[in-house]
């Protein structure tokens, strides 16, 4: 095995509470083989629940759709397990990818408007994508506000006198925005991949960094894609706490160049590396944004990595998700 590949088994598990025999629906992303990862030994254990594997048409993803009209009166555990051979990679020519699909705006990734102004003011150009990368890297701060007395305040996260984002907000304003969005279930907050939020407020996670980058890229007429998956820790086996995402942009004749801007912000010594390269410690589950899923009604799904669940057509979070890996 070469140094630039990694092999591991991944288990995606969802424990669903009893629905008191009301209709249960569950949607879970399914990974696919590509030029940079090989998925094998894929298995689904639905614990007796009816399921189909569906194609997401626009971006070519797959997902598991559980539709069990009788629901369940006991808890059920749905598991998908698969082996991954993942490559470290730089630019890649992917077959069957239409770059034109990745030029227009989505609900949380607008194109043009304020992004045109940013491009003009900062002389950004599609001939210098490193400039776009650096602009986002310098403008964003990695972190998640929770509350004023949270650990992030004891452990320097944002400085108390700093100004963040184009709106030059204070740390306390960042936190109150977060609390407000939580109480109103709004999406102008951390972790929704909202480019406007990223640009205005300048504090977020991987979804925010990469959405911001994609808005700027597409505004420059450089196709760019959003990739969502899981980071795989360095050890032999263990839990995976949550998702990770990254992006890539297209150069005619050269293919798609990956970027991982939030990882570069967390590890500044790797900033040069993560412009044009991504490491092997990951698995991709979905590409794109604003997914139409079978049975999910008319609304688009902005981000799809964790389970979506409905009981009698009403959104529910009566489940426990867990993810684990083991090196092969």
Language model feature labels by segment:
Residues 77-193, 200:
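Acidic low-complexity segments
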Residues 26, 80, 132, 166, ...:
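Cysteine-centered nucleophilic/redox motifs
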Residues 208-298:
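Hydrophobic/aromatic-rich core segments of domains that either
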Residues 32, 85-87, 142, 231-234, ...:
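Solvent-exposed loop/turn segments at secondary-structure junctions
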Residues 274-328:
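Low-complexity, Gly/Ser/Thr/Pro-rich intrinsically disordered linker/tail segments
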Residues 18, 72, 121-128, 198-209, ...:
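Extracytoplasmic/periplasmic, Sec-exported soluble proteins
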Residues 1-90:
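Intrinsically disordered, low-complexity N-terminal segments that are enriched in acidic
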